[in-house]
Amino acid sequence: MTTSASQLQTQYSPAATEVRWQKLWEETSAFQANSQSSAEPYCIVIPPPNVTGSLHMGHAFEASLIDVLIRFQRMRGKNALWLPGTDHASIAVQTILDRQLREEGLSRYDLGREKFLERAWQWKAESGGTIVGQLRRLGVSVDWSRERFTMDEGLSKAVLEAFIQLYEEGLIYRGQYLVNWCPASQSAVSDLEVEMKEVDGSLWYFRYPLTDGSGHLEVATTRPETMLGDTAVAVNPQDKRYQHLIGKTITLPLVQREIPIIADPWVEAEFGTGCVKVTPAHDPNDFAMGQRHQLPLITVMNKDGTMNENAGQFEGLDRFEARKAVVAALEEAGFLVKVEDYRHSIPISDRGKVPVEPLLSTQWFVKIEPLAQRALEALNGEEGPRFVPERWTKVYRDWLENLRDWCISRQLWWGHQIPAWYAVSETNGVVTDSTPFVVAKSAEEAQQQAIAQFGPDVVLQQDEDVLDTWFSSGLWPFSTLGWPNQTEDLETFYPTSTLVTGFDIIFFWVARMTMMAGHFTGKMPFKDVYIHGLVRDENNKKMSKSAGNGIDPLILIDRYGTDALRYALIREVVGAGQDIRLDYNRKTDESATVETSRNFANKVWNASRFVMLNLDDKTPEQLGMAATADLELADRWILSRYHATTEALINQIEAYDLGAAAKQLYEFIWGDFCDWYIELVKPRLYGEDAQSRLVAQQTLAQILEGILRLLHPFMPHVTEEIWHTLNQVGEDQFLALQSFPQPQSEWIQPELDREFQLMIDVIRTLRNLRAEAGLKPGQKITAILQSDSESERCNLEQSQAYIRDLTKTEMLTIVESLTEEPQALVGVTATVQVLLPLAGLVDLAALQTKLSRNLEKVEKEIKSLSGRLNSSNFVDKAPAEVVAETRENLLEAEKQAELLRDRLTRLQA
């Protein structure tokens, strides 16, 4: 049922409105894309949030940006698809389930794999939809009929296909490599799951004696416990201090192992003593050096973070206890030289919250170089993708050029189980590094392969590990559209159009998607990559769960409405890729920024209600378009501003300058339309000239209809509600599916805009003078406008009716020069002097007293600000932005003082 204008509430109420439209959009499949449409496709796949997650402000920001792009392109006639979905988040889900089991006094091993996975799927069914429901609260225009999950049947098939293809091409292998190992979760973790944290630690200096007894070398380390696995000491080949020692050996203290002194250009002669201990099994740089010099790999740690049998007397100790014990033993033996305080960064497991241990482990790897090469060729050619902002292209290129082989196995149960089966019957029933294996799509296929290789009695055991979550995420842009099958969706919507993502995960995810897509589809997965910044809190700090400074978007949605939050976040963007700051009072759950956007929604609502109540119950279609010859000056001006705004808006959105687009709309709607045009046409709406009234109605209806379409991608709910009332259409039609306005260049008249701006400046100045004189709102005045320019005087003559109406001016005089100056308050625009004669209007003595007091107050402020700026203590120590703001305040105060002195001088004359 359509609401009439007279039935509209006097204030916009988002709570009921937003839920209603979200329900209607979804029930009618308003945003379902058609793979058979002849329209140009435009596709964005959602960066899949973790199925464990709940909506945070980063999600709200990203979803708001994507929805502007999707709604805009849909209204531009594109076959727009926003494909939703969630990620299975192996480590996150398993962490939650392990915690639940611990509370029950159980472990996953007590349950067994099958029961554990049943529980995981049950948890996913019950709790995994939270973030999807919260995304719906944002009013996102996704195609829910195409919702995907990284472990659904189709994506699981894609993961299997990708793994087997890569394995058969020799691009997946098992091997020993240093991985990021989390002793808490006892699993390899990706680089992305590691956070560098600065800590106050120590740098220990030890003597390593030369085997021939001729002296010693001094090495420094932050991890003394790993010295038990040293297999060399390295120096720079150009370091003259040590050139004579290269090739000799030292005897490793505590272990009594003889190890060589090697030369390697990686060693920085200036760092520490210029000698470094080399532990290839416990440090990535040492591992690379060990490969170059064919050094043995000695692991001294178990997977749980305790020391193993290679640690000798320290076997069984926790790694940090071993650190203390090793230092004590070296000190007692006379090998400790000194200890220095040392602040450095250590890698922390994002999930286990403990320091990561570089650990030698047999894992599954993807050979990255051939995949990265294909992505680099695309970047260097025409395929792209294009990064916005462009500066991220170089960083992306650097990542592709410096990637190491990707460890894809994780010691978890929740996820895509690696499709490899070990012939344990060949190695006494256990899996070892030498156990032969087969790779297959199913257990049955694996059995057939194994029987062919090892005979009918072969016993198989599937690899217990699962694939890194990023493996399935890397296939996301094309697997969600049906790959490896050649589906209509894949043919229509792939490559996708735009990827919208934050820079914090770009190179772990974006690079993997481009590499996988280039390899499996021969195409880059998206044309553009739009990088947005982070949402920072009221103290300009990065929001994070660990810092506890996140802001729940749903709290602000409940208080201000979805449209207000969406618009506030987008309007805060200053240039693509820049972080935004959101103010928030944690005691009251209030945000001035979001409140401003809520007020804007109310302004749009109230202005629309006023317009509709003055259209005589007619729709824009019924009123029709005004004849050009009948348009008055204000009509032509608002049409010029409307088409110029439309043109700018289209250019800004297509350039991903969404913050500028939001600001442009705000200024046009609140400023040009509400503050000026509506006020200018009110006399015509209430006047007796029927033709002038009709033209005003036609123009108001036309501009309001256009505004609702322009604003819809940013504020979809309030605009949908108003549009239905304005056009009196049923709930089976949607503004979301209407066409976006097209600018008509013949209506854009920059000269008219300049003329009208002159009038606006004059009206503002006169209003300010009225306020300064303390006049009552309805009190009539006379005014004088003085300009040297004949064309300006002519323009002011044409618009003087508007000036008189909006400033309550009875008599307006426009002159080239003043023959005599009356006692008046004087203001100036850029080119016009505006005089408000005061005779008979105010008590001049009282006004002079008021101005004098104001001047005294401003002069005190100038003295205070000058004092601060003359203090080197303030200028040198205060934050730069505070000093700059103080300088601006001083300039403003000096201008104000000059103006007040001028006014007092004129009044006293």
Swiss-Prot record:
Keywords: Aminoacyl-tRNA synthetase, ATP-binding, Coiled coil, Cytoplasm, Ligase, Nucleotide-binding, Protein biosynthesis. A motif ('KMSKS' region) lies at residues 542-546. It catalyses: tRNA(Val) + L-valine + ATP = L-valyl-tRNA(Val) + AMP + diphosphate. Monomer. Its EC number is 6.1.1.9. This is Valine--tRNA ligase. The keyword rRNA-binding does not apply. ATP binds at residue 545. The gene is valS. Catalyzes the attachment of valine to tRNA(Val). As ValRS can inadvertently accommodate and process structurally similar amino acids such as threonine, to avoid such errors, it has a 'posttransfer' editing activity that hydrolyzes mischarged Thr-tRNA(Val) in a tRNA-dependent manner. Residues 841-909 form a coiled coil. ValRS has two distinct active sites: one for aminoacylation and one for editing. The misactivated threonine is translocated from the active site to the editing site. The C-terminal coiled-coil domain is crucial for aminoacylation activity. A motif ('HIGH' region) lies at residues 49-59. One of its GO terms (cellular component) is cytosol. GO terms for molecular function: aminoacyl-tRNA deacylase activity; ATP binding; valine-tRNA ligase activity. GO terms for biological process: valyl-tRNA aminoacylation. Belongs to the class-I aminoacyl-tRNA synthetase family. ValS type 1 subfamily. It comes from Synechococcus sp. (strain ATCC 27144 / PCC 6301 / SAUG 1402/1) (Anacystis nidulans). It is found in: Cytoplasm.
